[in-house]
């Protein structure tokens, strides 16, 4: 059942082992993915508005759009898939830009939906470490749906879990796996994000914090592992069905079965008339779409490369990415080039610096794999918006470099490391408009996109979040791509 909560200042909990975190929990209630697929068959299409491209990491054979023209949305609605993604990239925008982009997508989607006769339900995909424009995005989606005649939103369901990456929620407290064990996300480097920082790991208090007190922690409905595992889908559907007036519910999950119980409950509640919006991490999408976890793509499934060497673009500056780069260097066979942030911020040097790096990298690509990366030390502005503007400028420079390199020499593959980096590389450097997310290179992480048309057709595009995988993950992904 829902449980009352009492917001307090967060007390650091520190690390604990995963075994300690999971000890004493109720037995998992097994739900096959096929049961969810049957429950949603013929129902509303799940449309995921992805605030950066890394939300596709848990799914396979799902359409992805990087543009939201009505024709593109109609194409996605016609595909034989229980869900599709629209890459909004709003995590890289300020609040006003994010709000306007969400409005544009919903208005075009409503038109496309009516033209195709296919109804939909919306999920706003945010970061599993709780960064992004919440509650702004779900507020805008609710307003636009109401304006389109879809009625008011009964509830907003927050499900940040990302199972493969070790982002787990237990007793409404959200944890992340680290090299030292499980850590509450509010004590991680991601909680200190210059743009989307926060203090609380406990989701009801996090909701109160992010809504600036508009929603109190005591008013947040908590759906716990006891609800999911002991009482099951019908009970949880009742909790969801009781939501009114856009009330927020937060949901525990430590495994895919928990999310499939939730998916069944959501389908039941929706079939009974509940109008729900979802703010979710990557794992909920797979469960709600009725997909089971799939093995990573094999070298044979990737097919023969069209060129001898690949390009790796690295924009993420988090510590994990830096360690992954170190391991990739140890593997050898790389030429590495840096875009210096200080030179990029100098209007007199910027263009020449990008041109110099691009020319050298394109030449090296004929001989070996190439890494083009930004300065590893993050440069911040005076406030959150200024920091975001610097990030956008650096990302734009990386995009210019990738565009120039690939125009000169076709790579065997392109890996984009970091959320903003992977979005801008897809849309601006490679001009990907429609693609299929075919699967992952590593278990549950690192999505491979197959562009449908355009200059990137035939080039595997790998979306690699800055904050996922072990220290060897980038080297492992490159090793697989080299083995084709």
Show where each model-derived region lies.
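Conserved, well-structured core segments that form the ligand-binding/active-site neighborhood
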Residues: 173-357
């Amino acid at each position: 059942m829902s449980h009352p909560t009492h917001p307090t200042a967060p007390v650091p909990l520190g690390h604990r082992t995963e075994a300690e975190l999971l000890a004493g929990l109720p037995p998992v209630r097994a739900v096959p993915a096929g049961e969810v697929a049957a429950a949603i068959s013929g129902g509303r299409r799940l449309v995921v508005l992805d605030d950066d491209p890394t939300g596709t990491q848990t799914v396979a054979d799902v359409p992805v759009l990087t543009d939201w023209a009505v024709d593109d949305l109609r194409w996605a609605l016609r595909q034989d898939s229980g869900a599709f993604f629209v890459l909004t990239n709003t995590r890289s925008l300020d609040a006003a830009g994010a709000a306007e982009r969400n409005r544009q997508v919903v208005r075009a989607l409503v038109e496309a939906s009516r033209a195709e006769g296919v109804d939909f339900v919306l999920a706003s995909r945010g970061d599993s470490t709780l960064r992004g424009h919440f509650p702004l995005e779900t507020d805008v989606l609710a307003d636009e749906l109401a304006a389109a005649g879809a009625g008011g939103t009964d509830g907003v369901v927050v499900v940040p879990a990302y199972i493969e990456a070790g982002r787990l929620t237990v007793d409404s407290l959200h944890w992340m796996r680290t090299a030292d064990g499980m850590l509450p996300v509010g004590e991680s480097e991601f909680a200190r994000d210059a743009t989307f920082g926060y203090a609380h790991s406990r989701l009801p208090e996090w909701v109160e914090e992010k809504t600036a007190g508009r929603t109190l922690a005591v008013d947040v409905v908590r759906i716990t592992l006891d609800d999911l595992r002991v009482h099951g889908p019908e009970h949880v559907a009742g909790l969801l069905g009781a939501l009114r007036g856009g009330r927020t519910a937060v949901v525990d999950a430590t495994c895919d079965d928990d999310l499939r119980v939730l998916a069944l409950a959501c389908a039941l509640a929706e079939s009974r008339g509940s109008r729900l919006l979802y703010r979710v991490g990557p794992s909920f999408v797979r469960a709600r779409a009725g997909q089971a976890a799939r093995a990573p793509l094999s070298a044979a499934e990737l097919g023969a490369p069209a060129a001898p060497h690949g390009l790796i673009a690295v924009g993420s500056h988090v510590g994990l990415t830096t360690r992954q780069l170190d391991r990739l260097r140890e593997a050898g066979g790389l030429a590495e080039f840096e875009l210096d942030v200080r030179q990029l911020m100098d209007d007199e040097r910027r263009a020449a610096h990008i041109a110099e790096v691009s020319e050298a990298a394109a030449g090296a690509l004929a001989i070996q794999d190439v890494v083009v990366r930004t300065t590893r030390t993050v440069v911040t502005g005076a406030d959150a918006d200024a920091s975001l503007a610097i990030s956008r400028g650096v990302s734009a420079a990386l995009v210019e470099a990738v565009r120039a390199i690939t125009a000169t020499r076709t790579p065997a593959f392109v890996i984009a490391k970091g959320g903003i980096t992977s979005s801008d590389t897809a849309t601006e450097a490679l001009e990907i408009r429609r693609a299929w997310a075919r699967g992952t290179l590593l278990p549950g992480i690192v999505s491979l996109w197959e562009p449908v048309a355009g200059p990137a057709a035939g080039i595997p595009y790998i979306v690699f979040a800055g904050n996922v995988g072990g220290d060897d993950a980038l080297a492992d992904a490159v090793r697989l791509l080299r083995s084709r």
